[in-house]
Amino acid sequence: MTFRHCVAVDLGASSGRVMLARYDSKHRTLTLREIHRFVNCLQKTDGFDTWDIDSLEKDIRLGLKKVCNEGILIDSIGIDTWGVDYVLLDKQGQRVGLPVSYRDNRTTGIMPQALVQIGKSEIYRRSGIQFLPFNTIYQLRALTKQQPELTAQVAHALLMPDYFSYRLTGEMNWEYTNATTTQLVNINTDDWDDTLLAWTGAKKGWFGRPSHPGNVIGDWICPQGNRIPVVAVASHDTASAVIASPLANKHSAYLSSGTWSLMGFESKMPYTTDEALAANITNEGGAEGRYRVLKNIMGLWLLQRVLKERRITDLPALIAQTEALPACRFLINPNDDRFINPDDMRAEIQAACRETDQPVPVSDAELARCIFDSLALLYADILHELANLRGEKFTQLHIVGGGCQNALLNQLCADACGIRVMAGPVEASTLGNIGIQLMTLDELNNVDDFRQVISANYDLTTYIPNPDSEIARHVAQFQPKRQTKELCA
């Protein structure tokens, strides 16, 4: 078959898309077309920040039906989402309650309990995952302690992409790359860790053994009656994004830039040393047995909140105003946990500047400048941490995802990090999702083969560092800004 048509469902914390890919195996060309885009936002339910899971499923099905109604024969479907959140099911496979968002405050104070009762080193030795207060391990502990009556009804727990695959196929699956984000998978066995799971109060029977990307979960029957295989892709969106990052060699790092920024490198071995623990490095699962050694950064969430609060719709105009402002007048630590979900992001940023005896950003452009400068300096700091961890410097940084369209931030990143930045592709998560589908259909050999397809089909933008820039001169001064309560213990 010359042409393949694969559908990627890519759900982010603020929006979702159903994308159609067309792959010409003879010429190795790959094109994407957006079929359906929809909003994903939090809602308050019984005092919790929850996801409108039924609305998301409705939009997924609508997007799939749109493809089928065009007369296109779909070869496969794959679903990727954000990590750590889950859906509870009863014995009949029906949903129990609504999935609570990782941004809900129910996990406040839970992680310190684990550090005392299990031990930080022991948790890290078992999982290799960074300490974030909203990891699934702490969410489940909050669930079982705070809602025992709900817990009693539970027979299964599915992570978000696995739930949507289940709703399409009727088959349950626990995909490995996303499962590792829970901090509940043992890094040595690739299975759920009995000790960590027991601490949460959740039953091991809620979960099946994690499966690696590339297996067919089951079939979705389209309106025309065709059975379409649903593939377990690298269902954590960052895992998919890394697959589509055209990393040149071992000296290349990646930055998946969106609501969250995830900076790291690929490795065939995990890093679980005391140094890695001290730096709060995570070893999330990747495709083909690779590890995604990385750190979570709050990312463009801060900007998204400011845009929403200030009702700003013209982002390019705001960036143009921001670029005209002097650099580094206002600096914050974007990873300070005060920015996870404040009532008023603008006021929180201003308070952080005021508390550190800095000028206070007032205009929208000043707020954006504060966010961009601070992110770029944090990127540089973390890239330095990662280089020290592996004992080798990086020579190139690949920025992928929606954030790579921000030319100002890309240049600031290049200047602060002091290395060449390659930006693109924008639709990295979707493309990585498609890549695993094409491998499952035997159209591609492996991840490296797929990256050659990406390099041939998608243009990258290069940013050369300017060592004389204002932000480059502030790199050494930024470290004290990070002496705040970060997203870790």
From Swiss-Prot:
Task: List the EC numbers from the record.
Answer: 2.7.1.5
Q: Which GO terms describe its molecular function?
A: ATP binding; glycerol kinase activity; rhamnulokinase activity
Taxonomically, the superkingdom here is Bacteria
Q: What class of enzyme is it?
A: transferase
- SUPFAM superfamilies hit by this protein: Actin-like ATPase domain
Cellular component (GO) terms are:
cytosol
Active-site feature positions: D237
Q: Which residues does the annotation say bind ATP?
A: A13, S14, S15, G16, R17, T259, Q304, G402
Annotated substrate binding sites: G83, H236, D237, T238, N296
Query: Which reaction equations make up its catalytic activity?
Result: L-rhamnulose + ATP = L-rhamnulose 1-phosphate + ADP + H(+)
Q: Name one GO biological process term.
A: glycerol metabolic process
Which biological pathway? Carbohydrate degradation; L-rhamnose degradation; glycerone phosphate from L-rhamnose: step 2/3
Q: Which UniProt keywords apply?
A: ATP-binding, Disulfide bond, Kinase, Magnesium, Nucleotide-binding, Rhamnose metabolism, Transferase
Which co-factors does it depend on?
Answer: Mg(2+)
Question: Looking at the keywords, is ATP-binding present?
Answer: yes
| Listed InterPro entries | ATPase_NBD, FGGY_C, FGGY_N, Rhamnulokinase
Show the Pfam families listed in the entry.
Answer: FGGY_C (PF02782), FGGY_N (PF00370)
| Chain's role | Involved in the catabolism of L-rhamnose (6-deoxy-L-mannose). Catalyzes the transfer of the gamma-phosphate group from ATP to the 1-hydroxyl group of L-rhamnulose to yield L-rhamnulose 1-phosphate.
What PANTHER family does the annotation carry?
L-RHAMNULOKINASE, SUGAR KINASE
Cross-referenced NCBIfam families, in alphabetical order? PRK10640.1, rhamnulo_kin
Q: Which family does it belong to?
A: Belongs to the rhamnulokinase family.
Name of the protein in its database record? Rhamnulokinase
List the gene name: rhaB
